[in-house]
Amino acid sequence: MAIQIRFERLDEDGKIALHSPFHPALPAAAKARGGTWDKRGECWVFDSRDEEAVRAIARSIFGTDGSDAPRLVTVQHRVTGADASLQALWFGGRQVAHRSVRDAAVRLGAGTVITSGDFPGSGGSSHYPQLRGAGTVLEVRDVPVSLVVVDDDTWIVSADEKPSSPSPLAGVSDEDLAAELTRRGWTVTR
């Protein structure tokens, strides 16, 4: 499950737009960089001179700024006591578990499965639902490796050895590629 991030240059006054999924850390970071929410366009709008800083924000939250195919890993995360007291758990740039109301079952995000333990049928209060289920181990797939901090409660279980998006030149032989570059005036050396 690759997170879709896109930047767009707007015609008006040298602005850029960041199109991304919701993440609770993004509004404060965007506002701190002078961003404003465009309700109609469903995007954050920034001064184009801040593009590199805004891309850095996207990379820190989502693991990519949309210009690359980040290396993805599968991670297991043990729900901590602090996690269990939350209504929603965000990990790897996305929501991985959420309890909408006290007596609702916990819903897992895309690419997330329980490998051990479980969440109880209810948790928290009517005004403050909680996940509960401390000690439950979640497997979260397709996490950008740059977002993983390995510790006692989080560990990598497998790595994607290939980029998440194949190169458009993957099917072209080295000889054909060298011939085409030479035809275009490039000097090719090995």
Question: Could you say what each language-model-derived stretch is?
Answer:
Residues 1-190:
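Accessory DNA-engaging acidic/polar modules
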